[in-house]
Amino acid sequence: MRISKSAIRNPQSAIPMSKLSYISPKAIVKESPIQGRGLFAAKPIQKGEIVCIKGGSIFNRQTLQEVSETLGPAEIQIAEDFFIGPLSEQEREGSMIFSNHSCEPNIGVQGQIVFVALRDIETGEELTHDWATTDDDTYEMECKCGASTCRKVVTGQDWRRKDLQDKYAGHLSWYLVEKIRRKS
């Protein structure tokens, strides 16, 4: 994405409000066999390439509880009690990255909001991340990813598992890395 000089002077014009998140032009959104809509590779994507960047407003857990009632899940946790996502129905679509969960993901988080390809990805593959790399919450859900290594049940506490910490070393959200470091 090329940003004009006027956008640098006026950051509000850099990205239209309907596009709070970035999705690579090599990806498209369509119906997913996992759940709802998903993100899919429209062209081959190389390992390490940026696939999407989560955007939106930053808010605390209390605000999350308030907006989740009407907007459903649309946020990503970025710190102990902070999240990034939409605050209104008008922001929801533009803040989505449409990355469903998989126990064998092909994209992973770098830092807090940037998602990169974990391996070379072929056209047509759904672009998924393991929610254990971004979430610290109390939820529990049945997993429908279909991977041979599927955990069957995914929880907001899966980041605590040593096997997943090892598997996703370098691709855990910053705040989870800090929590793990403090516990060591």
Question: Which residue stretches match the model-derived regions?
Answer:
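C-terminal SET catalytic tail plus cysteine-rich post-SET Zn-binding segment of SAM-dependent SET-domain
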Residues: 101-184
